[in-house]
Curated annotation (Swiss-Prot):
Subunit structure and binding partners: Heterotetramer of two alpha chains (FadB) and two beta chains (FadA).
Name recorded for this polypeptide: Fatty acid oxidation complex subunit alpha
Positions contributing to NAD(+) binding: M324, D343, V400, V401, E402, K407, S429, N453
HAMAP family: FadB
Listed NCBIfam families: FadB, PRK11730.1
Function of the molecule: Involved in the aerobic and anaerobic degradation of long-chain fatty acids via beta-oxidation cycle. Catalyzes the formation of 3-oxoacyl-CoA from enoyl-CoA via L-3-hydroxyacyl-CoA. It can also use D-3-hydroxyacyl-CoA and cis-3-enoyl-CoA as substrate.
Gene label: fadB
Catalytic residue positions: H450
E.C. code: 4.2.1.17, 5.1.2.3, 5.3.3.8, 1.1.1.35
Organism: Salmonella typhimurium (strain LT2 / SGSC1412 / ATCC 700720)
Keywords associated with the record: Fatty acid metabolism, Isomerase, Lipid degradation, Lipid metabolism, Lyase, Multifunctional enzyme, NAD, Oxidoreductase
Site (Important for catalytic activity): E119, E139
Region (Disordered): 708-729
PANTHER family cross-referenced by the UniProt entry: TRIFUNCTIONAL ENZYME SUBUNIT ALPHA (PTHR43612), TRIFUNCTIONAL ENZYME SUBUNIT ALPHA, MITOCHONDRIAL (PTHR43612:SF3)
Length: 729
């Protein structure tokens, strides 16, 4: 053994070939600060071996290196810019030493090689991969850019266009595509990986392969003519501006850095990468996006822990076909859980099956599946008008009309047709689970399971624990949701649960703005372009359905009369009374027409102004800041109340529910991350300017306490240790 660290070791393999093996404790390898330091120490040993002829890098895990240790990011990003820059220089000196070894080097890459893992293998001369490879640089999705030389080496290896596509979009690619673009040199079966790697190294050692020529382009300026460079970078900047926009600075910074570094050799180019990385790491956007990643890991880990002793349901059923029922049936079948879809008439069943078939055909058109797979999946969705087969189902989700009487009747009837241990769930969006459970003999086997539309796209499923729901019931439904590829978040019961409970105060803020003379078009524009929502409130109401929102608004007002009961006729009432139900009938706040692809496209409709004039004061202009404050304060206050009341268990789960269920702008990180970023005291000062608008604008006492004591909602993060100690961590 030449060297042994905590996460890697170095040893002789054969005939002057050494192997450097990543083998961290636990299930995966990460390129954390300690591993970078250890890699440097291993290279120091290697540089003294005069009989060294070649080096093989490999992993003892199912994945090569899954990336940097993102749990370190928040503390690393808090160190002063100069100190972070020094550490990056140190890390890059390690990868440069790997690249500069006087012998051929090869990385045998299995499974994932992402972020720092990818940057590590870019420093070797050759890369051999297994068919399960996923390799790429996802850093821009975290609000940063590659910092270990990825933005320097990748363009010089692949050419500007392919590298820009991967780096700017934060993409990873599979083995076949990686081979096609030159990111790897060969693909072999797992059992042949080491044998193949040694064979390539031997060819390089004997001179049959020119490893020096392979290495040289990575050390030089990017080979692009002025015209080629202008075309590549202009197109890339245009695409990034269109897709990322102003709220996500990392992709544009990466493109501009690669452009600026193109005329330099490795050292100068790495310096430019460093100068671009460090300011990005100190942005609120980076902290928010890293926070989302960590929250996602936390939420998924919590679900995994909850279901560790539970068998995933093997047979499911959906009550109520239609678009929602068909979407749930498709998602379950697509992920391998057969499903019975029951309704009371053929028309609804046909609608549900058509929806499932449409979604499968989209997969076929995109080349994700073939006809055989499509037929196989659709055959596991069984439409029926009766309860045949319900004695075999493990879990049933009810997705009928949002009416408590109908839901109670359907659930009570179904309870008599299933096994005693079968779990029943309701896809209600607002009706308290306790109310629906009152119709059941076994309420302990019942809970809420709130999917979001469209089911196949929206990652969140709210799992609602009723007062009598058993732990096993919750665990079974969480297991099914996880199997469906969803992110389940368990919340406690109340009208609207978590997501809709906090959404309707936001809509109430919108209604009050319109009542006071705001133009809904400007409100939509400000909330989309300035705050960053994917849709403004008027557009969102049209998509949800004005009739649906009108009904839900009444349910919420009954549940929380002290805050959500209004004493005036609002825009939602006016549109509902005029049968302008939104996208579903082509008229809402906006008018909708189908485009060439059959998708609804919104247009202005002057007729709506006359309608809204009846419920509004004369038009007046509001500043962007005032619109954002009046829209967001009711939502933020209600989110805080939900945490204080135990409806949602943690800031992390609240923020992920908002991002995954409502599209809360990820660059803000969620409501609690947004609060922590600006500070509770600053938020309180802003909110107090609007408390005259009513109870929805009154800041909860818990938040006032946070402001008084300057306390964040997330645990404080300490800056990483000084760079000197990071080197030898």
């Amino acid at each position: 053994m030449l060297y042994k660290g905590d996460t890697l070791y170095l040893d002789w393999l054969e005939d002057g070939i050494a192997e450097l093996v990543f083998d961290a404790p636990g299930s995966v390898n990460k390129l954390d600060t300690a591993t970078v330091a250890s890699l440097g120490q291993a290279l120091e040993v290697l540089e003294k071996q005069h009989d060294l002829k070649g080096l093989l890098l490999r992993s003892n895990k199912a994945a090569f290196i899954v990336g940097a240790d993102i749990t370190e990011f928040l503390s690393l990003f808090l160190v002063p810019e100069e100190q972070l820059s020094q550490w990056l220089h140190f890390a890059n000196s390690v990868f440069n030493r790997l690249e500069d070894l006087p012998v051929p080097t090869l990385a045998a890459v299995n499974g994932y090689a992402l972020g720092g893992g990818c940057e590590c293998v870019l420093a070797t001369d050759y890369r051999l991969a297994t068919p399960d490879l996923r390799i790429g640089l996802p850093e821009t999705k975290l609000g940063i850019m590659p910092g270990f030389g990825g933005s320097v080496r990748l363009p010089r290896m692949l050419g500007a266009d392919s590298a820009l596509e991967i780096i700017a979009a934060g993409k990873d690619v599979g083995a076949e595509h990686a081979l096609k673009i030159g990111l790897v040199d060969g693909v072999v079966k797992q059992e042949k990986l080491i044998e193949g790697a040694i064979a390539v190294l031997r060819q390089a050692i004997t001179g049959d392969l020119d490893w020096r020529a392979k290495r040289q382009p990575k050390l030089e300026p990017l080979k692009l003519s002025k015209i080629e460079a202008a075309m590549s970078f202009t197109i890339a900047k245009g695409m990034v501006a269109q897709t990322a926009g102003k709220h996500y600075p990392a992709p544009m910074t990466a493109v501009k850095t690669i452009e600026a570094a193109a005329r330099f050799g490795r050292e100068e180019a790495l310096n430019l990468e460093n100068k671009s990385f460090v300011p990005l790491a100190h942005t609120n956007e980076a902290r928010a996006l890293v926070g989302i990643f960590l929250n996602d890991q936390y939420v998924k880990g919590k679900a995994k822990k909850l279901t560790k002793d539970i068998e995933t349901p093997k047979q499911a059923a959906v009550l109520g076909a239609g678009i929602m029922g068909g979407g749930i049936a498709y998602q379950s079948a697509w992920k391998g859980v057969p499903v019975i879809m029951k309704d009371i008439n053929d028309k609804s069943l046909n609608l549900g099956m058509t929806e499932a078939a449409k979604l499968l055909n989209k997969q076929l058109e995109r080349g994700k599946i073939d006809g055989l797979k499509l037929a196989g999946v659709i055959s596991t969705i069984h439409p029926t008008l009766d309860y045949a087969g319900f004695d075999r189902v493990d879990v049933v989700v009810e997705a009928v009309v949002e009416n408590p009487k109908v839901k109670k009747a359907v659930l009570a009837e179904t309870e008599q047709k299933v096994r005693p241990e079968t779990v029943l769930a309701s896809n209600t969006s607002t009706i308290p689970i306790g109310e629906l459970a009152s119709a059941l003999e076994r309420p302990e086997n019942f809970c809420g399971m709130h999917f979001f539309n469209p089911v196949h796209r929206m990652p969140l499923v709210e799992i609602i624990r009723g007062e009598k729901s058993s732990d096993e019931t919750i665990a079974k439904v969480v297991a099914w949701a996880s199997k469906m590829g969803k992110t389940p978040i368990v919340v406690n019961d109340c009208p609207g649960f978590f997501v809709n409970r906090v959404l309707f105060p936001y809509f109430a803020g919108f209604s009050q703005l319109l009542r006071d003379g705001a133009d809904f078009r400007k409100v939509d524009k400000v909330m989309e372009k300035q705050f960053g929502w994917p849709m403004g409130p008027a557009y969102l109401l049209d998509v949800v359905g004005i009739d649906t929102a009108h009904h839900a608004q009444a349910v919420m007002a009954a549940g929380f009369p002290q805050r959500m009961q209004k004493d005036y006729r609002d825009a939602i009432d006016a549109l509902f009374d005029a049968s302008r139900f939104g996208q579903k009938n082509g008229l809402g706040f906006w008018r909708y027409k189908e485009d060439s692809k059959g998708k609804p496209k919104k247009e202005e409709d002057a007729a709506v102004d006359d309608l809204l004039a009846s419920v509004s004061q004369p038009k007046r202009d509001f500043s962007d800041d005032e619109i954002i404050a009046r829209m967001m304060i009711p939502m933020i206050n209600e989110v805080v109340r939900c945490l204080e009341e135990g409806i949602i268990a943690s800031p992390a789960e609240a923020d992920m529910a908002l991002v995954y269920g409502l599209g809360f702008p990820p660059f803000h990180g969620g409501a609690f991350r947004w609060l922590d970023t600006q500070g509770s005291a600053k938020y309180l000062d802003m909110a107090q300017q609007y408390q005259h608008l009513g109870p929805l604008y009154e800041v909860p006492e818990g938040l006032r306490n946070k402001a008084r004591h300057n306390e964040p909602y997330y645990p404080p993060v300490e800056p990483a240790r000084p760079v000197g100690s990071l080197k030898t961590a």
